[in-house]
Amino acid sequence: MPDLKLVYFKMRALAEAPQLMLHYTGTAYSYEMAWDYFGQPWSEVKSSVLYRQLPLLVVDESTKIFQSGAITRFLAGLIELKPDDALLLAEVDALYEASQELFSPLNPTINFAVGEKFLSMRSDLIEQLAPRFEDFERILGSQPMTPFFFGKNPFYCDFGVFHH
């Protein structure tokens, strides 16, 4: 198993699904705050970082994988949380992508809004997300008597939906 280091911030957001996957499989990794990894405040280093955003997965101290979806898919292959069948993989990936689309409305509400602004945003959010949750429920219902979206064992999409 390669040495894995996940670099992000102190918040539940784009690095959460990869962390859940790593914990579920008992895969060793380290978690480093962006300012510690880069040795300076994020605002000072952001423009020099590929895509100007995090998370970042560092593999064996040399290979850097950016973008949360790429990190999740890489880890899913590494720790066997993706199906071998190409058609099932497409379904799993579609569900994962749908779960990631929840991030845009959720993140500002959950991680940054407070007081009256939070209450207002929460009401709008519940109305906006209800149809998405119905979609997830429909997929779960198509696999009766299984604990995960596509059977008895989880795939990376399950962690994406669970987190969001």
Give the ranges of each region predicted by the language model.
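Hydrophobic alpha-helical bundle segments that form small-molecule/ligand-binding pockets
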Residues: 137-150
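GST-like domain detector, emphasizing the conserved glutathione-binding G-site
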Residues: 1-130
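GST superfamily/GST-like fold recognition
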Residues: 92, 149-164
